[in-house]
């Protein structure tokens, strides 16, 4: 499909061809959900921990004799039913990461890109370059373009001034093409691709 290319000033800069195999799929929410769940599980720290009955600092001695008191039978005060006792089946430090086939991950990226195209939330910019590393001036450019919540994907090398100027603007993310991922595409309103990013995607999925 043919897609209009614009400059950061909002002027026309020609057209670019977008592959239907990447941007023209019918989006599947189940694929997107699987990839996002995999990304978030991989990101989760898993440092949660509760002490079990073998770890709490209490005596392990029997509370009172077994028979003759008329009370319920108990052993140690470390048991989970007592205040200060160990947690039964509590959380332990672990990795939440799980496997997801590489083909499903690649498919998820294509479906995320296609979903943005279908929602008319993609903008292609000829070059993501800023003359100076000034947040205020770049923020006014974004406001003119209507980009208040957007993910910018540049080429393999990001322009230093653009990256510095954009990193302090709320709801704006800037990534090189190597960092493109389903979660960041879905969580932002608009997807802004540079021409270099489009070419890299075409090369990656050809």
Curated annotation (Swiss-Prot):
One GO term describing the cellular component: ribosome
Phosphoprotein: present as a keyword of the record?
no
Gene Ontology biological process terms, A to Z: translation
Entry-linked SUPFAM superfamilies: Ribosomal protein L4 (SSF52166)
Q: Which Pfam families match?
A: Ribosomal_L4
Record's function text: One of the primary rRNA binding proteins, this protein initially binds near the 5'-end of the 23S rRNA. It is important during the early stages of 50S assembly. It makes multiple contacts with different domains of the 23S rRNA in the assembled 50S subunit and ribosome.
Family of the protein in this entry: Belongs to the universal ribosomal protein uL4 family.
How is the subunit organization of this protein annotated in UniProt?
Part of the 50S ribosomal subunit.
Q: Which PANTHER family match?
A: 50S RIBOSOMAL PROTEIN L4, LARGE RIBOSOMAL SUBUNIT PROTEIN UL4M
For this entry, the protein name equals Large ribosomal subunit protein uL4
Question: Which gene codes for it?
Answer: rplD
């Amino acid at each position: 499909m043919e897609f209009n290319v614009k400059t950061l000033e909002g002027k026309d800069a020609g057209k670019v061809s977008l592959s239907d195999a990447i941007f023209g799929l019918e989006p599947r929410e189940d694929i997107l959900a699987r990839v996002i769940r995999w990304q978030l599980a991989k990101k989760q720290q898993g440092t949660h921990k509760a002490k079990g009955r073998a770890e709490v600092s209490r005596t392990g001695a029997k509370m009172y004799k077994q028979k003759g008191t008329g009370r319920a039978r108990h052993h140690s005060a470390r048991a989970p039913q007592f205040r200060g006792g160990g947690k039964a089946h509590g959380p332990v430090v672990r990795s939440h990461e799980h496997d997801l086939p590489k083909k499903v991950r690649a498919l998820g990226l294509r479906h995320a890109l296609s979903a943005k195209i279908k929602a008319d939330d993609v903008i292609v910019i000829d070059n993501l370059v800023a003359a100076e590393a000034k947040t205020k001036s770049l923020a006014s450019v974004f406001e003119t373009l209507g980009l208040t919540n957007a993910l910018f994907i540049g080429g393999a090398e990001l322009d230093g001034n653009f990256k510095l100027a954009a990193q302090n603007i709320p709801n704006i993310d800037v990534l090189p093409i190597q960092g493109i991922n389903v979660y960041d595409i879905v969580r932002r309103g608009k997807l802004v691709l540079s021409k270099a990013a489009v070419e890299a995607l075409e090369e990656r999925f050809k």
